[in-house]
A protein has these predicted regions:
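NAD(P)-dependent short-chain dehydrogenase/reductase
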Residues: 13-19, 23-59, 64, 73
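Hydrophobic/aromatic residues within transmembrane alpha-helices
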Residues: 156-157
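Mid/C-terminal beta-alpha module of Rossmann-like enzyme folds, strongest
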Residues: 70-139, 167-195
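Alpha-helical membrane-targeting segments
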Residues: 37-60, 115-150
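Conserved loop-to-helix N-cap of the C-terminal "lid" that shapes the substrate pocket in Rossmann-like
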Residues: 19, 55-68, 86, 97-98, ...
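Active-site Tyr-X1-5-Lys
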Residues: 1-19
């Protein structure tokens, strides 16, 4: 938030800025995300999906290609925006914290014939390692986002763009898993498992 305040102050001196807030990123190129380093392990077949949230707690996910299309659309309208324009990107709302894991399991089962198991995310392990690793410290600090619902309201974005780019969840998950090297190429999928 401090960075946003500094950016906003800069716009009072002639700079222009567009800020897009979004949920947890996922996508084929998002190699440093909780999706790619927590829910699944990039470069490995998905044997299990880790659930980082408390049961019943909703969470917001942002598919990077959709976020990119949103930013491009906002940039195309920058002349009509205030010098400091802040928007919320709704993305995919996982109302009970299990929807993304269920989508991963369905995609993997369809592509490989094997349904991954679900396990709890090992927050306890992160707390032990956090003092020695900056990224893990940051993750532990953001743990509250997995203990309480935090949902971004995209009405202002919709008022400007008319709609928010939105790839269907399973399509986005499949592209992400392929890009992370967690799924076999379509030709390697078992007979009858491909879409």
């Amino acid at each position: 938030m401090e960075l946003e305040r500094r950016i906003e102050r800069a716009t009072q001196q002639g700079a222009r800025a567009i800020v897009v807030r979004a949920g947890d990123f996922f996508g084929a190129g998002a190699r440093s995300s909780l999706f790619s380093q927590g829910l699944v392990t990039q470069g490995k077949p998905v044997a299990a999906v880790a659930l980082p949230g408390d049961p019943g707690v909703g969470h917001q996910w942002a598919y990077l290609p959709d976020v990119a299309r949103t930013m491009v659309a906002l940039l195309a309208r920058r002349a009509q925006l205030a010098p400091f324009a802040r928007f919320h990107f709704a993305g995919h709302w996982d109302a009970d914290g299990t929807r993304i894991a269920a989508a991963i399991r369905r995609v993997v089962a369809r592509r490989t014939g094997i349904e991954p198991r679900v396990r709890r995310f090992p927050w306890w392990l992160l707390r032990i390692a956090a003092p020695f690793h900056e990224t893990l410290r940051g993750l532990v600090e953001m743990r509250y986002l997995w203990r309480e619902d935090v949902r971004l309201d995209n009405r202002q974005l919709l008022a400007v763009l008319g709609e928010e780019p939105h790839t269907p969840l399973e399509q986005a998950v499949e592209a992400t898993l392929l890009g992370l090297g967690c799924l076999p190429a379509r030709a390697d999928a078992p007979a009858g498992a491909g879409a």
